[in-house]
Amino acid sequence: MDEMSNVAKTTTETSGLTDSVLSLTKRMKPTEVTTTTKPALSNTTKFKGVVQQQNGHWGAQIYADHRRIWLGTFKSAHEAAAAYDSASIKLRSFDANSHRNFPWSDFTLHEPDFQECYTTEAVLNMIRDGSYQHKFRDFLRIRSQIVANINIVGSKQVLGGGEGGQESNKCFSCTQLFQKELTPSDVGKLNRLVIPKKYAVKYMPFISDDQSEKETSEGVEDVEVVFYDRAMRQWKFRYCYWRSSQSFVFTRGWNGFVKEKNLKEKDIIVFYTCDVPNNVKTLEGQSKTFLMIDVHHFSGNGFVVPEEVNKTVHEISDEEMKTETLFTSKVEEETKSEEKKGGFMLFGVRIQ
């Protein structure tokens, strides 16, 4: 009987102890949860070159040429990550694609062109003082004017109407240099475009094709040529002379253009030289002349102009259109004067 009493007493004490522990655990639980969920500052994030700061803001930095370069403080990690991407374009142009936080977009793909107008120090200063995005948007606005008002013609542009058919000084004019129908090898695994010699010698930068010079694997020299497409996107090609086939070719950069434009055999590539009128605003350091590359896709019914052209030309905000009235009115005037003369529409104007 005493033994049973002792067992019961022990059980009661144990139960009481257990209840006490459980009660203590329940009381401690909120404290433990609060402790584990308390945000802790970390020197690293999922973004490259971004660090969290004590005040809740985010810092951006980048390493280049064996030194750390501070890019500034930003309100969000995404802003800091974008600043890192912008800086990497200028500082790591040779492998910028492998050092990015965000994939290239229709917006950011124009950044390399924008940065070419400035020195490295100027780009870094704009990122630090917060003016980078504002100036980049100005650059895109000016570029949209070029896209919306460019005229592709075979010779000097003259307005059909107006004061005695005077030459327009408000429209951008382009002169066709040459065109080429693509062959199977141009869009095949060789990853190169052959430029006919008569055009290469006349319109492309000089590269010697002297057979007596010392040979290399592909040519004695090469240069980089820069073109813009309809959307004013920049395309860079390595231009060289292949002695093995005795041909002038585009190599590096051409394969990417083929894939982006979905080029096929029999498509036509057209090359132009374009002039920007003196009274049209450009950014400091920008040239008044540039080269353009255009694509005419082949279909069963002939050649067609890509639909995205009209989309690109007309996708301009109302506010921008108000500031561009001077330019668009000239294009509309020319279009109306040519409506009854046949031809086709290209870049918003009628071409004979």
Swiss-Prot record:
Transcription regulation in keyword set: yes
Localization, UniProt: Nucleus
Compositionally skewed regions (Polar residues) per UniProt: 7-20
GO BP terms: ethylene-activated signaling pathway
Record region (Disordered): 1-20
GO cellular component: nucleus
Keywords recorded for this protein, A-Z: Activator, DNA-binding, Ethylene signaling pathway, Nucleus, Transcription, Transcription regulation
DNA-binding region: 46-103, 178-297
UniProt GO molecular function: DNA binding; DNA-binding transcription factor activity
UniProt main location, coarse: nucleus
Its job: Probably acts as a transcriptional activator. Binds to the GCC-box pathogenesis-related promoter element. May be involved in the regulation of gene expression by stress factors and by components of stress signal transduction pathways.
PANTHER family reported in the protein's UniProt record: AP2_ERF AND B3 DOMAIN TRANSCRIPTION FACTOR (PTHR31140:SF80), B3 DOMAIN-CONTAINING TRANSCRIPTION FACTOR ABI3 (PTHR31140)
UniProt similarity note: Belongs to the AP2/ERF transcription factor family. RAV subfamily.
UniProt name for this protein: AP2/ERF and B3 domain-containing transcription factor At1g51120
Source taxonomy: Eukaryota, Viridiplantae, Streptophyta, Embryophyta, Tracheophyta
